[in-house]
Amino acid sequence: MSIVNGLVNRIDETYDVSQIEKEIKLDNIALSDLELLATGGYSPLTGFLGEEDYDSVVETLRLANGSVWSIPITLPVTEKVAESLKAGEEVKLVNNGNIYGVIQIEDIFVPDKEKEALLVYKTTDEAHPGVKKLYERPNVYVGGTIILTKRFENNQFPSYHLDPIETREAFKKRGWKTVVGFQTRNPVHRAHEYIQKSALEIVDGLFLNPLVGETKSDDIPADVRMESYEVLLQNYYPKNRVFLSVFPAAMRYAGPREAIFHALVRKNFGCTHFIVGRDHAGVGDYYGTYEAQEIFTNFTIEELGITPLFFEHSFYCTKCEAMASTKTCPHGKEDHVILSGTKVRELLRNGEIPPSTFSRKEVVEVLIKGLKKEVVTE
């Protein structure tokens, strides 16, 4: 266990867990968080947040020591389980009958979930998927440092499932000094492509890092999305300037706060820049269009350790006959074809084929095939 180049490493597969009797069952969110804590994806965190750090993150978007951190990474347990635990003991972390790690308990506390919902998600509305999940999870939090004792098998995308130390190495091998990260939970449409390629003009490489952890039920499945990224990169991007790897975290849908979180995590993966677009990590109408960009004004680039790149919403302009944004196009809204992942999903689900101004034909073919498969299995 160590910290090298600012990256936490909490992996020890030789760690003896045979004498540890107690266990905590992890849900899928906690399981993906355990992995990212251990591999350094969540550096400087070394475990699930204790009460002091939790309160500080919820209230100030910083850890108790002042480091920027915007999303509480917590380990919820039921009241019954909490009664059997005490600070100072080691407990196994289990999912599906497998022991994946241990936690050295430092803290057991009851959070104010309403306050967490209001400050982190800016709403207590249970129609919000992040708030819904927050309330569904157990009501007591356990804080403490973790050790990952077993690497996950059955990763859905083994060749794309890389630790921060591996992506950093890959960028170095390619000679990239500057790397821009792009977070997505949707297939890449033409507006995304325009933004990514605009960013590529000013950096050495693009790190396409789709989130493949838990998402809401109407998001396009990760395997379909991954195939869509592969065909897009293969046909429309210079191979030596892009790198694809998955981000195994769960989606929080926390808008502005999640934008900060996504930037900090991509810094750990080796990025120097991070793209923040319209309504980053948003859902419904809970956040303002550019609120996820505005939140960055509360922090300096030095303390973030990564430079955010802000982009206006892009569209296809029928007069320019090209992708553009309000910064580059003089024409009115009547000439703009607005693109969004939601719109693409809507068209596909209605049996319509998105036009080439929306999505590359190779991507559309993958999505249609995926949707047919989804219908068959439902």
UniProtKB/Swiss-Prot annotation:
The keyword Nucleotide-binding applies. Pathway: Sulfur metabolism; hydrogen sulfide biosynthesis; sulfite from sulfate: step 1/3. Disulfide bonds: none annotated. The keyword Nucleotidyltransferase applies. It catalyses: sulfate + ATP + H(+) = adenosine 5'-phosphosulfate + diphosphate. Keywords: ATP-binding, Nucleotide-binding, Nucleotidyltransferase, Transferase. Belongs to the sulfate adenylyltransferase family. This is Sulfate adenylyltransferase. It comes from Bacillus cereus (strain B4264). The gene is sat.
